[in-house]
């Protein structure tokens, strides 16, 4: 078995799927760790091509020899809620001003999408987590 590479950094970014460019914020974040920025952009864009239009978080692990690996996550819950509700942004005063409503069915779809990245064991628990995020954005849930 080959010796393990030593990890020097773990970088977390949220980038639009298929639209990674060396411009900020990606360039400076990777450049300070000596990563080949164009190589990352090409690999990320290829990996997220099917998810265009979504913000896809990525966790980049940088090794001692300046090589890297990355893992893409599911889009943020807030982004999925905004897309499902058809709104630009959440409420400025979420508990006073409601900006949209979601049905239980939409909530279940978002929960199933996010399930791999949430610390929930079943869809019901994931739904509660997503409902809490929606509530803090000024989005109400209807049955």
UniProtKB/Swiss-Prot annotation:
Disulfide bonds: none annotated. One of its GO terms (molecular function) is structural constituent of ribosome. The keyword rRNA-binding applies. It holds the Pfam family Ribosomal_L11. GO terms for biological process: translation. One or more lysine residues are methylated. Keywords: Methylation, Ribonucleoprotein, Ribosomal protein, RNA-binding, rRNA-binding. Gene3D superfamilies: Ribosomal protein L11, C-terminal domain, Ribosomal protein L11/L12, N-terminal domain. GO terms for cellular component: cytosolic large ribosomal subunit. Coiled coil: none annotated. SUPFAM superfamilies: Ribosomal L11/L12e N-terminal domain, Ribosomal protein L11, C-terminal domain. Belongs to the universal ribosomal protein uL11 family. Part of the ribosomal stalk of the 50S ribosomal subunit. Interacts with L10 and the large rRNA to form the base of the stalk. L10 forms an elongated spine to which L12 dimers bind in a sequential fashion forming a multimeric L10(L12)X complex. Forms part of the ribosomal stalk which helps the ribosome interact with GTP-bound translation factors. This is Large ribosomal subunit protein uL11. It comes from Acidothermus cellulolyticus (strain ATCC 43068 / DSM 8971 / 11B).
């Amino acid at each position: 078995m080959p010796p393990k590479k030593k990890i020097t950094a773990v970088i977390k970014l949220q980038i639009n799927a298929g639209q990674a460019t060396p411009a900020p914020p990606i360039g400076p974040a990777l450049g300070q760790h000596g990563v080949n920025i164009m190589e990352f952009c090409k690999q990320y864009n290829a990996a997220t091509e099917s998810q265009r239009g979504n913000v896809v978080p990525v966790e980049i692990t940088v090794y001692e020899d300046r090589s890297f690996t990355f893992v893409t996550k599911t889009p943020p819950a807030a982004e999925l809620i905004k897309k499902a509700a058809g709104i630009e942004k959440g409420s400025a005063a979420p508990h006073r001003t409601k900006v949209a409503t979601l049905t239980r069915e939409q909530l279940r779809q978002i929960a199933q999408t996010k399930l791999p990245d949430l610390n929930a064991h079943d869809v019901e628990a994931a739904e509660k987590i997503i409902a809490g995020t929606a509530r803090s954005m000024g989005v109400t849930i209807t049955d």
